[in-house]
Amino acid sequence: MTAPVRPVPTVRVYRFELVKLFATWRIRLLVLACWLAPAVFVAAVSRQSSLPVDTLFGRWMNATGWAGPLVMLGFAGTYALPLLTSVVAGDVFAAEDRLGTWRHLLVAVRSAPRIFAAKALASLTVLLLLVAGMAVSSTAGGLLAAGNRALAGFDGHLLTPGDAAAKVLLAWVSVLAPTLALAAIGLLGSVLGGRSPTGLLLPAVVALAMALAQLLPLPVAVRLALPSYAFVAWNGLFTDPVQLGPLLIGVGVGLAWALAATALAYLLFVRRDFTNAAHDGSRRRTLVVLPLVALFAATAGIIAAATPALGSGIGQDKVQQSVATAFAHLYRLQAGQLHRPDVTEAQLAATAACTKGDGLVEAEGPGNDWRCVVSWHLPGVAATGSAVYQLDVTSDGRYVADGDGPKEVNGYFQVRTPDGDQPNPLWQFDANVELLPTTKG
């Protein structure tokens, strides 16, 4: 009797697909770029006098090496990761259509599900290698250029180098969820598109659309239901207390999209008629989008029901609390740099009174017309200190506070520190408003 023909083990097919991916010049070039370019970029920028202050943690790049990988993370979430998922995952199935090698592959492997699993795992492996390269390289460049020093958090409190290292690692790990979502969308586009470049374009187009949506004043539930939200929610790791709620929701939504899009791609792939040489993707491409639309609607509904957040999530009380907290932390940092007596946040008892549009409009929502007056007390001093800030609040809750006097407190001047001259930390600072309701302790 003839022994039954068994499919090739998935591990062998996975190794074969991995070799095929690394055989292409573009993957080799991407690996080289991701492991070298971030270190060069971060090291070069950290030594400049003009820093990327419009980027989160950019103003701290020459003060600590832990700011560099966070600046790179912000760039990666906006530009690099969508493009990498397009190149790696968006073409893994379509390449076989262009080369006309599906029949040969099926004869060799004898299992469409194993081919799908191997290709998906090979793409995932390459993506993880690229993300790890950017994280390790940017961290190395930052530490070599600026040193292993304390990092000012997103609310101004100082993190020890050890705490900063742990949170930088967690931040990079957290963005794997939206990266997997984009990769799964790339797999789906590659299966759907056949010979067309749909798979290559789809992750980048979806990421661009979601990035544009994040700029709009969306309701909180809709914003958190976007699979790309974890690309910006990681900044909550650098506040005290940590803003875990939005980050966990963002990671969960990203993983849900990754599973849904991968399942759709798998079902379409295993049901494909490979005997039809004229087949060029699914004929029901529009209908395939419906499950993802339903997932988005269901996620937004669940978040809206589970959280009492209304509107944009940016309100007067939240802005005032955030500004007062950040000011108190940074005041202590400034006092230490100027060799003044240390005071605690409790002793300062900083408060903020904020208005929007000179008080002519309701104090809620994003905008660059926020104005805050911060007041504080020093032990043994009868007079109450005050300082004015102009705020530019974006739709995702992040804001830049620009000091508007008195110049002795929040004006621009250089402070001489053991690590070199640094701008007055109270002059300009970045912070954020947590969009979900918070419990005051």
What are the language-model segments listed below?
Residues 1-36, 273:
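Aromatic- and glycine-rich beta-strand/loop motifs that create alpha-glucan
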Residues 86-104:
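Transmembrane helix boundary and interhelical loop/hinge segments in multi-pass membrane proteins
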Residues 261-289:
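Cytosolic-side transmembrane helix boundary signature
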Residues 40-50, 196-229:
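Transmembrane helix segments
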Residues 366-441:
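Extracytosolic low-complexity repeat regions of secreted or lipid-anchored proteins
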Residues 60, 303-376, 424-441:
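Extracytoplasmic low-complexity, Pro/Thr/Ser/Ala/Gly-rich segments
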Residues 2-4, 35-87, 117-187, 191, ...:
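Secretory targeting signals
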Residues 279-309:
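Internal/C-terminal transmembrane anchor helices
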